[in-house]
Protein backbone atom coordinates (compact mmCIF):
# COMPACT_ATOMS: atom_id res chain seq x y z
CA UNK A 1 0.00 0.00 0.00
CA UNK A 2 1.59 3.33 -1.03
CA UNK A 3 2.07 6.31 1.23
CA UNK A 4 -1.08 8.37 0.54
CA UNK A 5 0.62 11.62 1.41
CA UNK A 6 3.72 11.69 -0.71
CA UNK A 7 3.29 9.38 -3.68
CA UNK A 8 2.30 10.64 -7.12
CA UNK A 9 -0.77 8.40 -7.07
CA UNK A 10 -2.36 10.52 -4.35
CA UNK A 11 -1.85 13.64 -6.43
CA UNK A 12 -4.66 12.43 -8.66
CA UNK A 13 -3.00 10.68 -11.61
CA UNK A 14 -2.36 7.04 -12.45
CA UNK A 15 1.19 5.78 -12.81
CA UNK A 16 2.58 6.67 -16.21
CA UNK A 17 5.95 7.91 -17.42
CA UNK A 18 6.77 11.53 -18.15
CA UNK A 19 3.56 12.92 -16.66
CA UNK A 20 3.82 15.60 -14.01
CA UNK A 21 0.80 15.18 -11.74
CA UNK A 22 -1.64 17.85 -10.68
CA UNK A 23 -2.14 18.00 -6.90
CA UNK A 24 -5.38 16.65 -5.48
CA UNK A 25 -7.02 17.60 -2.21
CA UNK A 26 -6.24 15.26 0.68
CA UNK A 27 -7.36 15.14 4.30
CA UNK A 28 -5.54 14.56 7.56
CA UNK A 29 -6.83 10.98 7.55
CA UNK A 30 -4.15 10.33 4.93
CA UNK A 31 -1.49 10.83 7.62
CA UNK A 32 -2.81 7.97 9.70
CA UNK A 33 -3.06 5.83 6.59
CA UNK A 34 0.54 6.67 5.66
CA UNK A 35 1.86 5.75 9.10
CA UNK A 36 -0.14 2.53 9.12
CA UNK A 37 1.10 1.63 5.63
CA UNK A 38 4.69 2.36 6.61
CA UNK A 39 4.43 0.20 9.72
CA UNK A 40 2.84 -2.57 7.67
CA UNK A 41 5.69 -2.43 5.14
CA UNK A 42 8.25 -2.54 7.94
CA UNK A 43 6.61 -5.60 9.47
CA UNK A 44 6.59 -7.31 6.08
CA UNK A 45 10.24 -6.49 5.35
CA UNK A 46 11.96 -5.62 8.65
CA UNK A 47 15.46 -6.46 7.44
CA UNK A 48 15.28 -3.82 4.71
CA UNK A 49 13.94 -1.22 7.12
CA UNK A 50 16.69 -1.89 9.64
CA UNK A 51 19.44 -1.87 7.02
CA UNK A 52 18.49 1.45 5.43
CA UNK A 53 17.94 2.95 8.89
CA UNK A 54 21.40 1.72 9.88
CA UNK A 55 22.99 3.79 7.10
CA UNK A 56 21.31 6.85 8.57
CA UNK A 57 22.48 6.01 12.10
CA UNK A 58 26.04 5.35 10.93
CA UNK A 59 26.05 8.66 9.08
CA UNK A 60 25.12 10.46 12.29
CA UNK A 61 27.83 8.66 14.22
CA UNK A 62 30.35 9.58 11.52
CA UNK A 63 29.48 13.28 11.79
CA UNK A 64 29.78 13.06 15.57
CA UNK A 65 33.20 11.44 15.25
CA UNK A 66 34.35 14.17 12.86
CA UNK A 67 33.25 16.92 15.26
CA UNK A 68 34.96 15.29 18.23
CA UNK A 69 38.14 14.52 16.29
CA UNK A 70 38.34 18.15 15.16
CA UNK A 71 37.86 19.35 18.73
CA UNK A 72 34.80 21.29 17.60
CA UNK A 73 32.16 19.80 19.85
CA UNK A 74 29.82 22.74 19.21
CA UNK A 75 29.42 21.44 15.66
CA UNK A 76 27.18 18.78 17.19
CA UNK A 77 24.42 21.37 17.59
CA UNK A 78 24.04 22.25 13.87
CA UNK A 79 24.74 18.62 12.95
CA UNK A 80 21.90 17.36 15.14
CA UNK A 81 19.57 20.02 13.76
CA UNK A 82 20.72 19.78 10.15
CA UNK A 83 21.47 16.10 9.65
CA UNK A 84 17.75 15.21 9.33
CA UNK A 85 17.79 17.31 6.14
CA UNK A 86 19.50 14.31 4.52
CA UNK A 87 16.69 11.95 5.52
CA UNK A 88 14.71 12.21 2.24
CA UNK A 89 17.68 10.92 0.26
CA UNK A 90 18.33 8.18 2.81
CA UNK A 91 14.74 7.01 2.27
CA UNK A 92 15.25 6.15 -1.41
CA UNK A 93 15.74 2.47 -0.62
CA UNK A 94 12.66 2.41 1.58
CA UNK A 95 10.56 3.91 -1.22
CA UNK A 96 11.67 1.12 -3.53
CA UNK A 97 10.87 -1.55 -0.93
CA UNK A 98 7.36 -0.13 -0.47
CA UNK A 99 6.84 0.11 -4.22
CA UNK A 100 7.79 -3.55 -4.68
CA UNK A 101 5.53 -4.66 -1.85
CA UNK A 102 2.64 -2.73 -3.39
CA UNK A 103 3.26 -4.09 -6.89
CA UNK A 104 3.85 -7.65 -5.70
CA UNK A 105 7.32 -7.69 -7.24
CA UNK A 106 10.15 -9.88 -5.87
CA UNK A 107 11.75 -8.43 -2.77
CA UNK A 108 15.38 -9.46 -2.47
CA UNK A 109 18.63 -7.65 -1.82
CA UNK A 110 20.06 -7.78 -5.37
CA UNK A 111 16.90 -6.42 -7.00
CA UNK A 112 16.40 -3.62 -4.47
CA UNK A 113 20.09 -2.67 -4.48
CA UNK A 114 20.11 -2.75 -8.27
CA UNK A 115 17.25 -0.28 -8.48
CA UNK A 116 18.82 1.99 -5.88
CA UNK A 117 22.20 2.05 -7.65
CA UNK A 118 20.48 2.54 -11.02
CA UNK A 119 19.21 5.90 -9.77
CA UNK A 120 22.66 7.32 -10.50
CA UNK A 121 21.57 7.68 -14.12
CA UNK A 122 18.32 9.49 -13.27
CA UNK A 123 17.41 12.59 -11.26
CA UNK A 124 18.26 11.28 -7.79
CA UNK A 125 21.91 12.48 -7.85
CA UNK A 126 20.72 15.99 -8.73
CA UNK A 127 18.24 15.97 -5.85
CA UNK A 128 20.93 14.57 -3.55
CA UNK A 129 23.26 17.40 -4.55
CA UNK A 130 20.58 19.97 -3.74
CA UNK A 131 19.98 18.37 -0.34
CA UNK A 132 23.70 18.16 0.41
CA UNK A 133 24.30 21.77 -0.58
CA UNK A 134 21.45 22.89 1.65
CA UNK A 135 22.92 20.91 4.54
CA UNK A 136 26.39 22.38 3.99
CA UNK A 137 24.96 25.89 3.71
CA UNK A 138 23.00 25.35 6.93
CA UNK A 139 26.20 24.33 8.75
CA UNK A 140 27.89 27.49 7.41
CA UNK A 141 24.97 29.67 8.53
CA UNK A 142 24.91 28.00 11.95
CA UNK A 143 28.65 28.59 12.31
CA UNK A 144 28.18 32.26 11.40
CA UNK A 145 25.34 32.71 13.89
CA UNK A 146 27.42 31.09 16.63
CA UNK A 147 30.41 33.33 15.88
CA UNK A 148 28.29 36.50 15.79
CA UNK A 149 26.59 35.86 19.12
CA UNK A 150 29.31 34.10 21.06
CA UNK A 151 32.35 36.04 19.87
CA UNK A 152 35.39 34.98 21.88
CA UNK A 153 33.17 32.54 23.74
CA UNK A 154 33.27 30.42 20.61
CA UNK A 155 36.45 29.01 22.08
CA UNK A 156 34.40 27.63 24.96
CA UNK A 157 33.36 24.00 24.79
CA UNK A 158 29.56 24.17 24.87
CA UNK A 159 29.32 20.48 25.70
CA UNK A 160 31.18 20.99 28.99
CA UNK A 161 30.03 24.57 29.60
CA UNK A 162 26.37 24.54 28.50
CA UNK A 163 25.64 27.52 30.75
CA UNK A 164 26.83 29.86 28.00
CA UNK A 165 23.75 28.84 26.04
CA UNK A 166 21.54 30.04 28.90
CA UNK A 167 22.86 33.60 28.80
CA UNK A 168 20.98 36.33 26.97
CA UNK A 169 23.24 35.97 23.95
CA UNK A 170 23.00 32.20 24.05
CA UNK A 171 19.21 32.13 24.18
CA UNK A 172 18.96 34.71 21.40
CA UNK A 173 21.36 32.68 19.30
CA UNK A 174 19.33 29.51 19.84
CA UNK A 175 16.09 31.30 18.98
CA UNK A 176 17.47 32.79 15.77
CA UNK A 177 19.11 29.53 14.79
CA UNK A 178 15.85 27.68 15.37
CA UNK A 179 13.90 30.08 13.16
CA UNK A 180 16.46 29.95 10.35
CA UNK A 181 16.81 26.19 10.68
CA UNK A 182 13.03 25.84 10.46
CA UNK A 183 13.16 27.83 7.24
CA UNK A 184 15.72 25.42 5.76
CA UNK A 185 13.63 22.45 6.89
CA UNK A 186 10.43 23.92 5.43
CA UNK A 187 12.09 24.58 2.08
CA UNK A 188 13.53 21.09 1.90
CA UNK A 189 10.25 19.54 2.99
CA UNK A 190 8.41 21.41 0.25
CA UNK A 191 10.93 20.22 -2.35
CA UNK A 192 11.11 16.57 -1.37
CA UNK A 193 7.78 15.56 0.17
CA UNK A 194 6.41 14.92 -3.29
CA UNK A 195 9.44 15.59 -5.47
CA UNK A 196 11.58 12.68 -4.34
CA UNK A 197 8.90 9.98 -4.73
CA UNK A 198 7.93 11.54 -8.06
CA UNK A 199 11.39 11.29 -9.64
CA UNK A 200 11.57 7.71 -8.42
CA UNK A 201 8.18 6.86 -9.89
CA UNK A 202 8.33 8.71 -13.21
CA UNK A 203 10.76 10.05 -15.76
CA UNK A 204 10.46 13.75 -14.98
CA UNK A 205 13.14 16.39 -14.62
CA UNK A 206 14.20 17.70 -11.23
CA UNK A 207 12.71 21.18 -11.65
CA UNK A 208 9.30 19.79 -12.64
CA UNK A 209 9.34 17.41 -9.68
CA UNK A 210 10.18 20.20 -7.24
CA UNK A 211 7.48 22.46 -8.67
CA UNK A 212 4.91 19.65 -8.46
CA UNK A 213 5.95 19.01 -4.86
CA UNK A 214 5.49 22.65 -3.87
CA UNK A 215 2.14 22.67 -5.70
CA UNK A 216 1.03 19.70 -3.60
CA UNK A 217 2.10 21.49 -0.42
CA UNK A 218 0.36 24.75 -1.30
CA UNK A 219 -2.79 22.87 -2.35
CA UNK A 220 -2.95 21.12 1.03
CA UNK A 221 -1.16 23.42 3.49
CA UNK A 222 -2.79 22.24 6.71
CA UNK A 223 -2.39 18.56 5.92
CA UNK A 224 1.22 19.02 4.87
CA UNK A 225 1.93 21.10 7.97
CA UNK A 226 0.46 18.34 10.12
CA UNK A 227 2.57 15.77 8.26
CA UNK A 228 5.71 17.85 8.83
CA UNK A 229 4.89 18.13 12.54
CA UNK A 230 4.44 14.36 12.77
CA UNK A 231 7.85 13.87 11.17
CA UNK A 232 9.38 16.39 13.59
CA UNK A 233 7.81 14.71 16.63
CA UNK A 234 9.06 11.29 15.56
CA UNK A 235 12.50 12.79 14.95
CA UNK A 236 12.63 14.45 18.37
CA UNK A 237 11.48 11.22 20.00
CA UNK A 238 14.42 9.49 18.35
CA UNK A 239 16.90 12.19 19.41
CA UNK A 240 15.62 12.56 22.99
CA UNK A 241 17.43 9.50 24.42
CA UNK A 242 20.74 11.07 23.37
Model-based region annotation:
Residues 1-242:
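Hydrophobic alpha-helical membrane segments
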Amino acid sequence: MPDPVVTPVTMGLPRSPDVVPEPASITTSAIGSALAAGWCDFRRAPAFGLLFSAFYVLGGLALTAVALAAGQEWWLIPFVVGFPLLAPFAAVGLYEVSRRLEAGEPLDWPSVAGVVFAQKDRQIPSMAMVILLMFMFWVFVAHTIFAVFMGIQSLTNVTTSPEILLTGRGLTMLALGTVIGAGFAAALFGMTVGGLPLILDREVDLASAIIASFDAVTANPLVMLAWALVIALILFAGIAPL
